[in-house]
């Protein structure tokens, strides 16, 4: 059967194409590894209303893409905002199909709370207020969720000029409703191993918040640190590719 497939789920304000630099490296290092990158609804070629979006709808969309690709054995990776989506995908697919869940600098609220609750102090109140207002006025969040100059500061520190251009060009509008919806991870199977990739120079999700999110998840079996910014798939594609390939190889089934 060989290697399990690798499913990559993007975070907020971006689409499936943000993984391209890392996928290019994976194709060189492990050409037999099947990789599926999914667009969440309202991104890329995937239709969807960002204003009325809900977590269950996004979970169903990812599961549908996995089913359409006929993937029965996989490792799933969620970046950033995918911390509210990927656990639901794992719950639906179960431990029989998911070998491991990897969360990279993800935002994981305490069960029963919302993504905005992961923000510190007054920022949480402001983010909730802004998201509610945007839902009421049927306005999606601006590309990347931030003005360009701030997005460059928050997402792109330490990048080369080419990496910054790629990142900012790929930013897109985000759903305000997802930000304030409460999560429910009550059915997530404990049998699926959990790995966390912690970004040490992250200005979007600080190390402190990441550790709080790990605790909210109930802990992880493996913690891998990378000295880079939030968009690690762009800033450190070689290192991330090596990590993801290594995790998949742990579950390789030798052909007779």
Describe each region flagged by the PLM.
Residues 138-188:
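Conserved alpha/beta-hydrolase catalytic His-Asp/Glu region
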Residues 2-47:
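Conserved HGGG/HGGXW glycine-rich cap/lid loop of the alpha/beta-hydrolase fold
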Residues 91-92, 96-139, 178:
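Flexible "cap/lid" loop of the alpha/beta hydrolase fold
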